[in-house]
């Protein structure tokens, strides 16, 4: 794709050249109420692996329903923080308290790799996200509703092998959404996608977040993605929060706008300064 074509797409109204958005608008919406999101309070959070202190004392409050993005250089601790929030790791010190009693399935994670079962069709892969409720009478209807939300209900009977990379990630998103999580954590889920598919997926993530109302926490290396999606951007440096920047811009946001570019520049300057301090450039 030429730079001119990409700029044309970025300047277009949301959905104008977005096959995902068009599919979702054309399909009937599942008649499900918004999710009751969870707030998070993180106090004195530390994580070490042997002698390596990855997180060095994180204090953070995330209100229910907020969309938070986390950026930082490789090895700064951002993915470790996400895994601690998701309960995939145990902290060395400190604690994470959710706003209400958290139940199994309230927190879900979507990774960069879709991790689909190759021997199961799309609908069955989505049903996996229901966990112990997979055998409930409404399991198939709930999985169908999740596929409609991501614009893939016409692929319910396909095998994962025939899907594109973007379609596989949309199935993974449906699998995460099907249990109606109250917190959804994203660990660089769009990192392996091409530019156009990535933009379409960013818009889809924003749409399902607005529709379901869960608390969203996204780890990404892409500063433009972080600013476009977030209510708030956290910069992690050397295991600590180096910057906590609110993004007070109306939605939907215009990619390539001067306001977004200014915020991206501010965050990039902080990241580059941290790199210079670390490597003494």
Curated annotation (Swiss-Prot):
The keyword Transport applies. It holds the Pfam family ABC_tran. It is found in: Cell inner membrane. ATP binds at residues 72-79. It is a peripheral membrane protein. GO terms for cellular component: plasma membrane. Transmembrane segments: none annotated. Keywords: ATP-binding, Cell inner membrane, Cell membrane, Membrane, Nucleotide-binding, Translocase, Transport. The keyword Electron transport does not apply. InterPro entries: AAA+_ATPase (IPR003593), ABC_transporter-like_ATP-bd (IPR003439), ABC_transporter-like_CS (IPR017871), ABC_transporter_ATP-bind (IPR050166), P-loop_NTPase (IPR027417). It catalyses: ATP + H2O + aliphatic sulfonate-[sulfonate-binding protein]Side 1 = ADP + phosphate + aliphatic sulfonateSide 2 + [sulfonate-binding protein]Side 1. Residues 40-263 form the ABC transporter domain. Its EC number is 7.6.2.14. GO terms for molecular function: ATP binding; ATP hydrolysis activity. It is an enzyme of class 7 (translocase). Part of the ABC transporter complex SsuABC involved in aliphatic sulfonates import. Responsible for energy coupling to the transport system. The complex is composed of two ATP-binding proteins (SsuB), two transmembrane proteins (SsuC) and a solute-binding protein (SsuA). Belongs to the ABC transporter superfamily. Aliphatic sulfonates importer (TC 3.A.1.17.2) family. This is Aliphatic sulfonates import ATP-binding protein SsuB.
């Amino acid at each position: 794709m030429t730079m001119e074509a990409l700029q044309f797409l970025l300047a277009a109204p949301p959905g104008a050249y977005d096959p995902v958005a068009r599919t979702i608008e054309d399909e009937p919406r599942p008649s499900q109420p918004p999710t009751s999101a969870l707030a998070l309070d993180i106090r004195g959070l530390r994580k070490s692996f042997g002698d390596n202190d990855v997180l060095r004392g994180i204090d953070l409050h995330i209100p229910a329903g907020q969309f938070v993005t986390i950026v930082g250089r490789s090895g700064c601790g951002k993915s470790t923080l996400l895994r601690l929030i998701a309960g995939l790791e145990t902290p060395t010190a400190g604690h994470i308290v959710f706003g209400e009693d958290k139940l199994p399935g309230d927190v879900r994670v979507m990774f960069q790799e879709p991790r689909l079962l190759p021997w199961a069709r799309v609908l069955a892969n989505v049903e996996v996200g229901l966990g112990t409720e997979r055998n409930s009478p409404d399991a198939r209807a709930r999985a169908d509703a999740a596929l409609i939300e991501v614009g893939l209900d016409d692929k319910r009977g396909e095998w994962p092998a025939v899907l594109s990379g973007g379609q596989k990630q949309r199935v993974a998103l449906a699998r995460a959404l099907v249990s109606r999580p109250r917190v959804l954590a994203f660990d660089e889920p769009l990192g392996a996608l091409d530019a156009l598919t990535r933009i379409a997926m960013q818009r889809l993530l924003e749409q399902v977040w607005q529709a379901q109302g869960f608390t969203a926490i996204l780890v990404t290396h892409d500063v433009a993605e972080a600013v476009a999606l977030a209510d708030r951007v956290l910069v992690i440096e050397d295991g600590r929060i180096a910057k906590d920047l609110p993004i007070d811009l109306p939605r939907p946001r215009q990619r390539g706008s001067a306001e977004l570019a200014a915020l991206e520049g501010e965050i990039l300057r902080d990241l580059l300064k941290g790199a210079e301090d670390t490597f003494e450039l």
